[in-house]
Structure formats: structure tokens, C-alpha cells
Amino acid sequence: MEIIERAPAKINLGLDVLHKRVDGYHEVESIFASVDLADHLTFENLEEDIIRIETDSSFLPVDRRNHVYQAVDLLKRTYNIHKGIKIYIEKRIPVAAGLAGGSSDCAAALRGLNKLWNLGLTMDELCEIGSQIGMDVPYCLRGGTAFANGRGEKIEALPTMPQCWIVLVKPRISVSTSTVFNDLAVDELHHPDIAGLRIAIENGDYTGMTQTVGNALESVTIARHPIVQQIKDRMLKYGADAALMSGSGPTVFALCEKKTRAQRIYNGLKGFCEEVYLVRTLK
């Protein structure tokens, strides 16, 4: 038996950092949305009790560093499963891009194995397992548009964000999330209006949404990587309704109500960066 699971990318429409917690993590508020750029995972049972991860990406590890491997291993140990599995990851989401590609692959692995092995786990149980691997995994299991707080692990579903076209651009740099958080001074950050953004989304107000998107981490990443600001400026020059860095970066996205504008931005950035994608939101 072979099954296939999609693993959609996600963007941060809003991200605020409130303070550093006593446990060393930062208290955050964020609004996520799934987009139709996705990896695909194919699952196949093996007779030998091994975990085999394969992929078409040369940038992706296939050992214990891979979130998919970790998901399989955790399920096998937690539920005393003695079965072998081969998972092939068809990679379409850029690696280390701030689009939760690894977390979404992990979520797809948990969903797929729950079906393939007839585990009968509820969504809450899958989220509990996923949270042990990464804080974005519970969101990626549910997908859609959602509000997150705490360390990012507390998820509340929202209505699907107003439909629009999205241009994703990943520059040829890597950004360390831990470095960004270590560099930030919470008192000096620009704090976006997450409450206003949430209201706009709940009301289906596209204009209100574009006016309230914001990312408190942008200034920190831009200080180290000015190309992020250059991409934003180009997007706005070509007619984006809004442009924002996703997560800790380096990917930047543009929101466009009209496909013609999105296509213009796509064409204008294609020569500036290699990895440019024209996508839509997912429900």
C-alpha cells in the first residue's frame, strides 16, 4: 500500500514578540496562513524494520536531523511499532526559508503514518506528538489561517484569510532563527497590530489586512541582511498591496488582489532572485 500526503508552506501575516519568558523562550503572537506551494510525501511499507528517508533535494538531510525521520522514530518508540517505512520527500518548498517546510513535512509524516499504520490517533494526539519535534508542527497539522501565541504552540483557528495572490521570494542567504532572537531587543522593536490584523481577517477585509500585516523580527534580520529590504522595496515598486518578511526570514512575500500585479512582481523579481513563486492561499 502506498499513500501520498501534501505538506503546504505557511507564511506569517503577523508576528510580534512580547517578552522573554522565564523558560528562556520568547512569548509571541502570530497569525499564520497556508499557501499552495507544497512538498509531497510518498509512504511505502518495508518488510525490514528500518526508517528510510529519500528526497530529490540535495540540501535536505535524510538521517536523524530530518524532522520526518524524527516523527517516524517518535511514533515507533511511543506506540511500540516494529514496522519498516520508506518515505520519499518531493521537495518544492525552499529549505531554511522561514516557510515551515521542515515542520510541514513532519506534520505530513504524522498524518500519513496515522493512516498507513491504522493508529487511530486524534488530531489533538498528533499535535501533542508533533509539539515534541517542533513548535510549528501543531499548526502545520491543522493548516489554514490561525492565531498562535505562547511559544507559538497554542493554536486557534481563524476564518480563511481573504483570497489573494502571493509572490514568495527567497534570496540566496540563510538566516538562523536563534541568532535573530538572540539579537533582538524587545523594547526597541516595532510591534505590529496583531489584534487589528485578526479583526480584518475575521471580517474578510482585504484592505484592512494589507494595512495591518507586520513582523517584529524584520528590522533585526534586515540589519544583518539588507537584501530583505531590497526585495520588499521592489515588490512595492511593482505594485504589491503589502510586502513582508515571513517568520525570521529570509523569504519575503507580496500580497496582491489582482493577478496581473502579482505576475508583474513575479516577473520583476525573477531576474533578481532565483527562487520566486506565484501562489495562492489555502482554506
Curated annotation (Swiss-Prot):
Catalytic activity field: 4-CDP-2-C-methyl-D-erythritol + ATP = 4-CDP-2-C-methyl-D-erythritol 2-phosphate + ADP + H(+)
Positions bound to ATP: P94, V95, A96, A97, G98, L99, A100, G101, G102, S103, S104
Swiss-Prot/TrEMBL keywords: ATP-binding, Isoprene biosynthesis, Kinase, Nucleotide-binding, Transferase
Class of this enzyme: transferase
Pfam families the UniProt entry points to: GHMP_kinases_C, GHMP_kinases_N
Pathway linked to the protein: Isoprenoid biosynthesis; isopentenyl diphosphate biosynthesis via DXP pathway; isopentenyl diphosphate from 1-deoxy-D-xylulose 5-phosphate: step 3/6
GO molecular function: 4-(cytidine 5'-diphospho)-2-C-methyl-D-erythritol kinase activity; ATP binding
GO annotation (BP), single: isopentenyl diphosphate biosynthetic process, methylerythritol 4-phosphate pathway
Homology family: Belongs to the GHMP kinase family. IspE subfamily.
Function: Catalyzes the phosphorylation of the position 2 hydroxy group of 4-diphosphocytidyl-2C-methyl-D-erythritol.
Protein name per its UniProtKB record: 4-diphosphocytidyl-2-C-methyl-D-erythritol kinase
Species annotation: Enterococcus faecalis (strain ATCC 700802 / V583)
Taxonomic lineage of the native organism: Bacteria, Bacillati, Bacillota, Bacilli, Lactobacillales
